[in-house]
């Protein structure tokens, strides 16, 4: 194989390489044997057409495209490796010569990984805005949240307040004319919940069961029903019941209702304190890691980030997101329907963060390379087993999906992240 690379501009060039006749000839024979099985040529049994007759009737050149499709991927990969390139996007392939009996010549326009000039990435000083300590207020807030989840609604005689639930009938009209979707009966509405358009719930505060209230509101300009958007409406609203939330007493019985594994309120508080401490410690570690990596990226210089890398990152992120949905049993089309979004919206969402993520990935890879990190067979096997456990898959299935090179890359990246993070100190 003949290989050459010509730089055209920063991070771009043309990789020219050949596919030899030693590779082409056996592949021509293989493709011919496959093609002739389906050929019907008068005077010959199906599948028994001699090669010279085929070449005379159809031309050897008619096989070239299939041969090229079979040989090109490995030839390109070998050329990239021989040229010592790190290619970061799909190439633009141009077959410059495909003559009979001659080596074929291919020119590939490639985008190469940009140069990363590392700054300081070890022993960094970082600031984080995450508290590690668990306070009594944290524990009480957690218990109060669970306590409210066990609250019951009880009828009250007094006037409705924010936080109460009212059971109502309502009939809406605009200029005295009722409109579709503006009527409801025995509807339970939490005051202050924001379920209804702005101003509706506020006008029921201070009223009691048995009262009828004329609620005057204006539909927002961006309201989903365009025929109602921006218009003033009157809702004749009858309050049937006012209900207040009644929370259970804060005692040992509540603790057992919240968590059957505890006997007392003190036990529950201690359990929550430990859980919150573990969660805060994890959040603190994540914050330190994020701050340290961000600082390492800021300290580095990347020579002209190719736009193709950003596109590749967006594509990868979208595919990863959609793959996670499917692993959870969620159909992507159903997700877009429920959320009222499109795949284009998803692309735009990831586009905003793709440049930052691409820079981060490049810097971490550069750190791994600078430190000479590698992965042993034992580490690769351990990574496979961990992935199999995480995704409830067979080890063999993980191995079939991920190459050893991909696993090695992931392990070295983890080592680089660990180095940057473990040597950082918090101001």
Swiss-Prot record:
Source organism, top-level taxon: Bacteria
Keywords of the record: Cell cycle, Cell division, Chaperone, Cytoplasm, Isomerase, Rotamase
Compartments in which it is found: Cytoplasm
Protein's UniProt keywords contain Iron: no
GO molecular-function terms, A-Z: peptidyl-prolyl cis-trans isomerase activity; protein folding chaperone; ribosome binding
Cross-referenced InterPro entries: PPIase_dom_sf, PPIase_FKBP_dom, Trig_fac, Trigger_fac_C, Trigger_fac_C_sf, Trigger_fac_ribosome-bd_bac, Trigger_fac_ribosome-bd_sf, Trigger_fact/SurA_dom_sf
Designated name of the protein: Trigger factor
Species this chain originates from: Streptococcus pneumoniae serotype 19F (strain G54)
Gene: tig
